[in-house]
Amino acid sequence: MFARDIGIDLGTANVLIHVKGKGIVLNEPSVVALDKNSGKVLAVGEEARRMVGRTPGNIVAIRPLKDGVIADFEVTEAMLKHFINKLNVKGLFSKPRMLICCPTNITSVEQKAIKEAAEKSGGKHVYLEEEPKVAAIGAGMEIFQPSGNMVVDIGGGTTDIAVISMGDIVTSSSIKMAGDKFDMEILNYIKREYKLLIGERTAEDIKIKVATVFPDARHEEISIRGRDMVSGLPRTITVNSKEVEEALRESVAVIVQAAKQVLERTPPELSADIIDRGVIITGGGALLNGLDQLLAEELKVPVLVAENPMDCVAIGTGVMLDNMDKLPKRKLS
């Protein structure tokens, strides 16, 4: 039995794994629950996420990746090992080749950390590839043609924006403004306006169910419970789409600005292609209501949300694994 090639979208919020010949076989939160006293791993992924904010003092649920890079090496390694063992992709005599995606502007030290964690978790050859490039492939863009393609990949920790032509990134930007920051903005808004403390999971719920970032694009409301900062007792309030739009306005403006700067640095010939083809948004942030409308209005180009935006990077790794022999031999070490 030979080992299978696997592609990993090692995200700040979720880990997706694509196994060659099988498709996406794993999609779990990047969360690990540890016993603080012994350092023992108690749960990984979905099971650990359910513990967030609900555990006794000696159990901590941590996210080992922050802003798209490894914040806790040992825990990342334990998490990857757990997921890979779960899949049973190792051969009797061989280890799998791995293709892992990372943000565009990470340092060589950060690249090395990702590579080492993957090797220790059972990878034979580990290849690193830039996330927006893989997301563009997963979204079905023809990036190996001599024409301009622009992708905005909004994950949990980072937003990666890139213009790609002939299979390479021409201009790009990676900013630490993405899904997690949106949740924090909502959480802080509720705290400020209502003197109510809510958890990150509630903030994420609000984002998914009622949020919009384009004025008047959505009119919905949600009842949420939290702890009153004055009385210390539980209290229920209703939050609407207009309030969430206000809470997210500044954060989204940062992404719009970064996208504008990438477009401004793009050679004119490629800009003309982008005006024709449009910009594609991928990642979980692409599901934020009204974001495509806002970007289209600000960038003055068509903007499309990819099909299955959250899976684009993992799908892209699958395409790249199938064409591994044709790809430029660029093993990042």
Swiss-Prot record:
GO cellular component, one term: cytoplasm
Disruption phenotype: Mutants are bent and twisted at irregular angles. Depletion leads to a strong defect in chromosome segregation.
Pfam families documented for this protein: MreB_Mbl
SUPFAM superfamilies: Actin-like ATPase domain
Record: residues binding ATP: T12, A13, N14, G156, G157, T158, E204, D205, I206, K207, G284, G285, A286, L287
Disulfide cysteine pairs (residue numbers): none
GO biological process: cell morphogenesis; regulation of cell shape
Keyword Transport attributed: no
Alphabetized GO MF terms: ATP binding
Keywords (A to Z) from UniProt: ATP-binding, Cell shape, Cytoplasm, Nucleotide-binding
Function: Forms membrane-associated dynamic filaments that are essential for cell shape determination. Acts by regulating cell wall synthesis and cell elongation, and thus cell shape. A feedback loop between cell geometry and Mbl localization may maintain elongated cell shape by targeting cell wall growth to regions of negative cell wall curvature. Filaments rotate around the cell circumference in concert with the cell wall synthesis enzymes. The process is driven by the cell wall synthesis machinery and does not depend on Mbl polymerization. Organizes peptidoglycan synthesis in the lateral cell wall.
Note: B.subtilis has three MreB paralogs: MreB, Mbl and MreBH. All paralogs have the ability to support rod-shaped cell growth normal conditions. The multiplicity of paralogs becomes important under stress conditions. They are probably used to allow cells to maintain proper growth and morphogenesis under changing conditions.
Similarity comment: family membership: Belongs to the FtsA/MreB family.
Subunit structure: Forms polymers. Forms a complex with MreB and MreBH. Interacts with MreC.
Name of the featured protein: Cell shape-determining protein Mbl
Protein source organism: Bacillus subtilis (strain 168)
Name of the encoding gene: mbl
